[in-house]
Each structure stands twice: as C-alpha cells, then as structure tokens.
C-alpha cells in the first residue's frame, strides 16, 4: 500500500514537472510568432520570408521528434527531456545578437529543438499511469501547448519595455531555470524503458501499420493547424484589422490559450467517449469554423427597385476571434483524442509512434506558415490561410469516413508492433 502511494505521488510529480517544463519549451518554440514581427520590419521581409522565419523552429522541432521518442523508450524520459532543454539555452540567447536573415534562420533551427520535448514527455508521462487514466494524463501534459499563449501575453510587454533583443535573453534564462527545476522534481523508473534487446529497427516497424499514417494526417490538422495559426494570427490581426502588436497578440491568445489548456479536457472526454467519436466531431467543428473564416471581406452590388445597393460582407474582429476560440477549443480536444488512439493501440511503442505522429503534426506546422505567406503574396487575400485549412479538414473527414467502421466503437485490431522482450 505504501509503495502504491509512493508511485502515485511520483506519477503526479512527474506529470506536474513535465507539464510545466513543456509549457516553457512551447513558449520558447513559438517565440517568432511575436519576435518575427519587429524582425520582419527591421529586415524588410516579404510575407513568404516571414512565414519561413516563423516556421524554422517548427521544422527542426518536428524532425527530432522521432529520434527523441525512440531515445525516450530506450533511455527514459527524464535524461532526454533535461538534455533537450539544456541544449537550447545558448541558441536562444544568441538570437538577441543576430543581425542578418540567415542568422535568424540558423538559430531558429537550433531553438526548434525545444519543440521536440513533446515526443519525450508524452511517453514519459503516459507510462506512469494506468491505461484508464492515460488519456487524461497525456491531455494534461499536452496542455503545455498553452505556452504559445504565454508568449503572446509576455513577449509584447518585454519588447515594449526593453526592445526585441531582450526577449530571447529572458527566454534563455527561463529555459535554463526550468531545466534545473525539472531535474530536481522528476523521477526515473527503469521498468518504463524498452529493453536493450529491442532494436531501433524493431521499434520502427510500427511505420508499416496503416493506422500510424492515418493518425499522422489527423494530427497534422489539429496540431499542425494549431501551430501554423498560432504563428500567424498575431500578424493577421495587425495586417487585417490594424491592431498594434500588444492588442494583436492578446487577441491571438484567444485562440492559443484554449488550444493548449483545454487539451486536458480532450483527454478526459476521449477516455469517456472514445477517440473515434471525439475526433470525428472535432473535425466537423473545425470544418464549419474554417468555412466561415475563409470567406474574404466582400462588397456586393445588388440591384433593387430603388437603385444599386452596396452590401458589405466581412467578419468583425470580435466575430473572427469568437470563431477562432471555437476552432482552438476543438483543436485542443482533437490533439488529445488522436493521442488517445496511440495510447490505446500502441502501448508498447508509445515513444516511437508518438514521435512519428508528432513529426507529421510538426511538419504541418512548418509548411503552413510558409504556404500562408505564399498564398498572401500570390492572391493578396489574407483569409486564403483558412481556405487552405478548410481543404485539409475535408481530407480528414473523408479519410475517417472510409477508414473506420460506422459504429466506430469497436476496438481496433491488435497493433502489429514489436513487443518488448
């Protein structure tokens, strides 16, 4: 009994320290969402160049997720998580001294390692909890996505007070302090590691399972779309509605905050109602929101008996923000429900599978800001970003419709993965 209480206490401590650390990592990872705006002005970048700048941390953070997930299975989450955080401190600090576009791109790639912490923390946290509580635990950890909102609350104030160069220095100190706190308040359980008799190649055999690629596509929508919009919305408010940086970041946080914090709710709902049903409804909510958000401001000329009447159709900033809030809430729940699939169907390879799925979501978050900028340069229509997202949701709905049996409640067949010896 005493041993069970100690295990529960350690599990709660691991969950708390990991969630806090992931929140800080995500805040650093999303730094260019705000920092990129004064840098864009300073360097005279076009929209596509800004999109590439904002997306560079997402690229590296995505690419490292697979090896980090595998290393977590092999060596344990505590040492890998700590190592990732420590390795980003110097690159983040050096951003404050960058003066050329290529320097920002290179340092952005290096700071992007912070985004790989998700592939470490997910299996690390999940293995401390039984399956019936795993969805909620992973949802609580995933609420660290709210670090994006933290950046939007804190970064404009720091830039206004001390200039943009101060922001990366403050974030570097915060990352160092967080890494040390995590090491002090986390634990290692060797029983959670995949035995050395299981090779990396054996762990990667899950890639032959079609379900993995299905979940990659879903996650590229709910997480990739979230990251892409989190990076883009501050600039969108500035350009579309004329808000200053502080007000634009605050309004953008109305999307980022629920999109992160409510992930825990998604884990709880998925535990109760099943991953399929929750993900299905999430996609439909996103479909409706993106359809409405994609409609550009339009002036219609209507011929009436009294002459020509001009009718302006456009979303006010408040209606726009309300729709973003709903979409962010749905995405938060969807991020947890997709990982509920993984926890249920791949219990022996959570690290490898979550790394692959996280890679797909992260690559979506990398590609989308670049495409947002390219579409804006090509069309001049800011809402083209939502037209693109609307199309990706359509793909998910069609894929879900033809991939699952209608009832969606029957358990999936056993995973074809390498069992730990």
Where do the model's predicted regions map?
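Glycine-rich segments within core transmembrane alpha-helices of 12-TM secondary carriers
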Residues: 135-153, 358-368
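Juxtamembrane intracellular "pre-TM" segments in multi-pass secondary transporters
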Residues: 1-9, 187-216
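Symmetry-related core transmembrane helices of the 12-TM Major Facilitator Superfamily/SLC fold
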Residues: 166-183, 384-402
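C-terminal transmembrane helical hairpin of 12-TM major facilitator-type secondary transporters
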Residues: 276-338
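Extracytoplasmic gate region of multi-pass secondary transporters
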Residues: 32-33, 210-261
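Conserved MFS/SLC helix-loop-helix module at the cytosolic interface between two early adjacent transmembrane helices
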Residues: 63-102
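Cytoplasmic helix-loop-helix junction between adjacent transmembrane helices
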Residues: 107-144
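Helix-loop-helix hairpin linking two adjacent transmembrane segments in secondary transporters
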Residues: 140-187
């Amino acid at each position: 009994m005493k041993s069970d209480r100690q295990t529960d206490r350690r599990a709660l401590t691991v969950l708390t320290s990991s969630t806090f650390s992931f929140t800080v990592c995500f805040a650093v990872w999303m730094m260019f969402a705000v920092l990129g705006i004064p840098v864009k002005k300073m360097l005279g970048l076009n929209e596509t160049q800004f999109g590439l700048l904002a997306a560079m941390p997402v690229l590296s953070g995505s690419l490292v997720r697979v090896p980090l997930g595998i290393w977590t299975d092999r060596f344990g989450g505590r040492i890998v998580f700590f190592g990732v955080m420590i390795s980003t401190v110097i690159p983040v600090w050096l951003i404050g001294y960058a003066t050329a576009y290529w320097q920002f791109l290179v340092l952005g790639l290096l700071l992007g390692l912070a985004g790989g912490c998700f592939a470490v923390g997910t299996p690390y946290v999940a293995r401390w909890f039984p399956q019936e509580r795993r969805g909620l635990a992973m949802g609580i950890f995933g609420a660290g996505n709210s670090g994006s909102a933290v950046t939007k609350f804190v970064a404009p104030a720091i830039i206004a007070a001390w200039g943009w160069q101060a922001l990366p220095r403050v974030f570097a100190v915060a990352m160092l302090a967080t890494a040390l706190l995590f090491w002090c308040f986390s634990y290692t359980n060797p029983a959670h590691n995949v035995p050395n008799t299981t090779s990396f190649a054996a762990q990667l055999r899950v890639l032959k399972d079609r379900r993995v690629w299905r979940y990659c596509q879903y996650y590229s929508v709910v997480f990739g779309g979230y990251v892409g919009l989190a990076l883009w919305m501050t600039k969108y408010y500035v350009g579309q509605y004329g808000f200053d940086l502080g007000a634009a970041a605050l309004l953008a946080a109305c999307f980022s905050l629920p999109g992160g914090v409510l992930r825990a709710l998604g884990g709880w709902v998925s535990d109760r109602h099943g991953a399929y049903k929750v993900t299905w409804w999430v996609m439909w909510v996103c479909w409706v929101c993106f359809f409405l958000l994609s409609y550009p401001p339009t002036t219609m000329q209507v011929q009436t008996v009294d002459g020509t009447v001009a009718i302006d159709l456009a979303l006010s900033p408040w209606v726009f923000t309300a729709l973003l809030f709903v979409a962010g809430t749905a995405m938060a729940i969807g991020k947890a429900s997709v990982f509920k699939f993984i926890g249920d169907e791949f219990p022996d390879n959570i690290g490898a599978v979550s790394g692959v799925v996280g890679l797909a979501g992260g690559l979506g978050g990398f590609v989308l800001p670049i495409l947002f900028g390219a579409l804006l340069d090509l069309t001049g229509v800011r809402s083209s970003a939502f037209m693109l997202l609307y199309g990706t949701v359509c793909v998910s709905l069609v894929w879900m419709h033809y991939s699952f049996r209608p009832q969606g409640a029957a358990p999936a067949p056993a995973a074809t993965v390498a069992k730990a010896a």
